[in-house]
Amino acid sequence: MEKYEKTKVVGRGAFGIVHLCRRRTDSALVILKEIPVEQMTRDERLAAQNECQVLKLLSHPNIIEYYENFLEDKALMIAMEYAPGGTLADYIQKRCNSLLDEDTILHSFVQILLALYHVHNKLILHRDLKTQNILLDKHQMIVKIGDFGISKILVSKSKAYTVVGTPCYISPELCEGKPYNQKSDIWALGCVLYELASLKRAFEAANLPALVLKIMSGTFAPISDRYSPELRQLILNMLNLDPSKRPQLNEIMAHAICIRPLLNLYTDIGNVKMRRIEKPLSNVQAGPHGRPGGWITSTRTRGGLSSLTSSKMMHPLPLFSVYTWGSGISTPLRLPMLNTEVIQVSLGRTQKMGVTKSGRLITWEAPSVGSGEPTLPGAVEQMQPQFISRFLEGQSGVTIKSVSCGDLFTTCLTDRGIIMTFGSGSNGCLGHGNFNDVTQPKIVEALLGYELVQVSCGASHVLAVTNEREVFSWGRGDNGRLGLATQDSHNCPQQVSLPADFEAQRVLCGVDCSMIMSTQHQILACGNNRFNKLGLDKVSGTEEPSSFCQVEEVHLFQLVQSAPLNTEKIVYIDIGTAHSVAVTEKGQCFTFGSNQHGQLGCSHRRSSRVPYQVSGLQGITMAACGDAFTLAIGAEGEVYTWGKGARGRLGRKEEDFGIPKPVQLDESHAFTVTSVACCHGNTLLAVKPFFEEPGPK
């Protein structure tokens, strides 16, 4: 006992005394179970040893942590975690007749669910799950199960035949002497959930025979109708007399009412409040530092072309790079990378965002006014702009797959197919059922029942596609851009009607329009078709369509009608403000829409509603449109731009130029472009080194 100082006796268990002790090394409070081995029967000693054996196998935040065991004065001492909030049974008793909210019930229940799932995954049966063995932390928010004294480790048998446990929680099969397996723990879990909802036990009687009769007949008082039908049905399912009809733990975890509280655990439990609140870099995108469950920013670095020359001499250039230009930056500017690989980028009106290979969100923002280097009075040379890169830190377990930016709002898609949005809530583009701004990524709850595979943001609306090829849209509805047959706006996702044989693969949002690409390379479009930027005019050759064949606006998704968009296999497409670009399977590049600034890539500025094949470009793999310029990527990493050149749009010091010309990136090795995004007058482009496959020797 050199390590511990006994404080008081807090209970007497089945086999011994329970002490509250203070650990001398760090003054932490721990529980010490004192089990007098010599006075115990063989079965009792085996039970005590079993508890140690089981606790060593378990490691979970919702299970009482095991520290060590040792012998002291012929007694077995087990040191374990102290839960100061008391038992769940005490908590329920103190409620008197004041029923708990359903959210509170589910918050506690899913923690027990996760703990039991961990136990069963270790091939262990708890066999004595009850509210007296479920403990709470000091805030009574975190639930931990304990008391594994009569647990059973399943080595080779799949069932345990001994009848143990508290009578009120014993399952019907145990009353009949049938084997005990995981489904008996499910019954006990159902009893605990019933107790949380009713503040009383499901099965109680004056004597054991009467109790067994109630259990065998499945007779218990109905649950209050203040709770949802889903919760009441879940309890009924878990308390089914037939063990085979009780749900498995993973089925319960997948239940509709459990998904949200389970997700909340991973975003809320264990968060640390920050006392010092940093000034955000922008009004919308900065995370709510110090707010529970929020995303915080960290790891600042600065980068810019002004220091590029000196850094070359000291350190080799990074293998993975992200470049930006536009808004006054006339040549590609390498952004600080935080020593990571960015695999996808997106641009909004004010946001520059990326996703790293490890599934983290990274953002680049200009420093706030006054935070840069001071300039000398009378200086005329303009400093190259600098950017600060930050990781947007979520809670553990969240891996971001892709990001898409709108005007002042952002959507991100996780590897589990869940969409989260944050930023400005105007026009309902966050999809949360309201128009409120959200400064931390928040799950779009209406889509939790679907697995999303891709999402796209326009200026003020969003489209998303599921793994079942369904499409949802929400946000601003002007011009029919949502494809819902009206111009109404929606602040909650709405399912889009698609042709019966159309299998959606990719969605794309423009400023005031939308497109959907199918697995068969068909294209649907809706919204504003000004200048035929969606290809909805009936065009069969090189002649301009008659006014009868011209389409200005559609409110439902329709197949594109302009050749060759409706005849060639289109593999990549992007929409700008007034024009669009498409890439065929053969690597050809077609532009269509306005040509006011030469953004269609032809030598003249004449307006035409006929798609134009950009000459001189071959092997194009991807392309993008800004407000009045176009960008294309070649198979070997070549970057071409054309159109309006003001304020650095083209990545070179030229004004409007209607013929594609290359953009020079500061790369000393061969590279490929992994992702590109254009928005308004800006471009964001990610590259990685290109390594040739070694040939046969």
Curated annotation (Swiss-Prot):
What gene codes for this chain?
Answer: nek8
The source organism is Danio rerio (Zebrafish)
Cofactor(s) listed = Mg(2+)
Concerning PROSITE patterns, the annotation shows: PROTEIN_KINASE_ATP (PS00107), PROTEIN_KINASE_DOM (PS50011), PROTEIN_KINASE_ST (PS00108), RCC1_3 (PS50012)
Query: Which residues make up the binding site for ATP?
Result: V10, G11, R12, G13, A14, F15, G16, I17, V18, K33
Record PANTHER family: PROTEIN CBG16200 (PTHR44535), SERINE_THREONINE-PROTEIN KINASE NEK8 (PTHR44535:SF4)
Q: Where does it live in the cell?
A: Cytoplasm; Cytoplasm, Cytoskeleton; Cell projection, Cilium; Cytoplasm, Cytoskeleton, Cilium axoneme
Reactions catalysed, semicolon-separated, are: L-seryl-[protein] + ATP = O-phospho-L-seryl-[protein] + ADP + H(+); L-threonyl-[protein] + ATP = O-phospho-L-threonyl-[protein] + ADP + H(+)
Q: Which InterPro entries match?
A: Kinase-like_dom_sf, Prot_kinase_dom, Protein_kinase_ATP_BS, RCC1/BLIP-II, Reg_chr_condens, Ser/Thr_kinase_AS, STK_NEK, STKc_Nek8
Q: Does the keyword Repeat apply?
A: yes
Q: Supply the name of the protein.
A: Serine/threonine-protein kinase Nek8
* EC annotation from Swiss-Prot or TrEMBL: 2.7.11.1
